[in-house]
Swiss-Prot record:
Function noted in UniProt: On ligand binding, forms a receptor complex consisting of two type II and two type I transmembrane serine/threonine kinases. Type II receptors phosphorylate and activate type I receptors which autophosphorylate, then bind and activate SMAD transcriptional regulators. Receptor for BMP2, BMP4, GDF5 and GDF6. Positively regulates chondrocyte differentiation through GDF5 interaction. Mediates induction of adipogenesis by GDF6. May promote the expression of HAMP, potentially via its interaction with BMP2.
Active site feature: 362 (proton acceptor)
Binding site for ATP: 240-248, 261
Region (Mediates specificity for BMP ligand): 107-109
Gene Ontology molecular function, alphabetical: ATP binding; BMP binding; BMP receptor activity; metal ion binding; protein homodimerization activity; protein serine/threonine kinase activity; SMAD binding; transforming growth factor beta receptor activity, type I
Boundaries of every Protein kinase domain copy: 234-525
The species this protein was found in: Rattus norvegicus (Rat)
Gene encoding the protein: Bmpr1a
Gene Ontology process terms (BP): angiogenesis; anterior/posterior pattern specification; atrioventricular node cell development; atrioventricular valve development; BMP signaling pathway; cardiac conduction system development; cardiac right ventricle morphogenesis; cartilage development
EC annotation from Swiss-Prot or TrEMBL: 2.7.11.30
Extracellular topology ranges: 24-152
Name of the protein in its database record: Bone morphogenetic protein receptor type-1A
Amino acid sequence: MTQLYTYIRLLGACLFIISHVQGQNLDSMLHGTGMKSDVDQKKPENGVTLAPEDTLPFLKCYCSGHCPDDAINNTCITNGHCFAIIEEDDQGETTLTSGCMKYEGSDFQCKDSPKAQLRRTIECCRTNLCNQYLQPTLPPVVIGPFFDGSVRWLAVLISMAVCIVAMIVFSSCFCYKHYCKSISSRGRYNRDLEQDEAFIPVGESLKDLIDQSQSSGSGSGLPLLVQRTIAKQIQMVRQVGKGRYGEVWMGKWRGEKVAVKVFFTTEEASWFRETEIYQTVLMRHENILGFIAADIKGTGSWTQLYLITDYHENGSLYDFLKCATLDTRALLKLAYSAACGLCHLHTEIYGTQGKPAIAHRDLKSKNILIKKNGSCCIADLGLAVKFNSDTNEVDIPLNTRVGTRRYMAPEVLDESLSKNHFQPYIMADIYSFGLIIWEMARRCITGGIVEEYQLPYYNMVPSDPSYEDMREVVCVKRLRPIVSNRWNSDECLRAVLKLMSECWAHNPASRLTALRIKKTLAKMVESQDVKI
């Protein structure tokens, strides 16, 4: 690098000298002589040979603009040539000058070739005062090629070449350094992976690891090192879903299927919050999506936020209801299991390792998954809020994301919800849960009749409703999803209708609690002899 800087400095010095030579005027190139007489001409001595310029006769020339200091009547004496020259300056003005030219170099000067950047013409003669009547004319304007052979363009070309070479050198050094760093990181990653694989004994299943963590750990999930190990060893199989937060993939860990939620980097707040909620002490419940691990994967150039959970091949309640119908037992099993999960979220567990009360804030059929046994589990806790009863504080996530407008409670839509108290968040969840029960009930067959699957308010608002659309329907008109007349003729659906109506009441204080919903559905399950 020092050699490069030295070369650039030398180049700068050369360019300075070149520009200095180019900047000299014609007075330094076309040297005239002073006044001389014929007697001043040298005579050859015996045995002495004179130079050619000393044998030439002297001429008297007319001078204008190039006169020596001892010129008389604008004349000068030379043994070379008389000349006249016309030049054009930078402003486009022409000047005609004349004078005497020394013998040395006169042949070269008289053959002066025009330059693209300086228009001029010189004419020479060799008789007394012959240049007084010379009228040289400027050469025509010629737009020459970029490389016209001039020193100035040569300097520019050299400078450009030096800059390009320097850029190539710097780029090569940077790329090589980055490549070495990448190779080093990859090697370190592979070594860590090998060490982590040895950390989890062969034959240990996810269920074994989770059971061990619950019995001997803090109750907040697997140790972080184990989570990172599992995340590194996941094999992605296929994408099964995509949403506003990111993508969901079906992956495998040692042959076991897992769901991998890959968050967009812009949704880091949601990833962090959901990971934090899942790792809350005593959070694990059969009707809450089973959390396995979370990790940030990537190198310096890319980052992936992983959330690894149990995989449920039946998909979401939304997907399930679109293609499947229910009998009363299946309906009650879905509703009751979902209520159990919501009740666990809302309930605070006291003790040395207690669990805070949690409100979901984005309950909808797409955020409830269907397990193999036909029960539900609640997922997507990226917007959840926690309540700390010791400090009486509501822990609200620092997240720009908001819930789904179609499922928002009236107090959320009209912005009357008190954000500093926890109970309003609980009641907003209950409103959303009532809409989910409505979605389930529509797909329940009674008397051979069933409605097609629809989202709540499907016939009242657009497919992607705005706040204003929902506020007009829910808050101003106080409308609720339509109910089929057949519901009143069936004992089970009639009870479900009463339940959902008490869930979506306009006044939050009039709504049922999750515990009351759970107990009511438990009685219905018992009366129908449903096996949970």
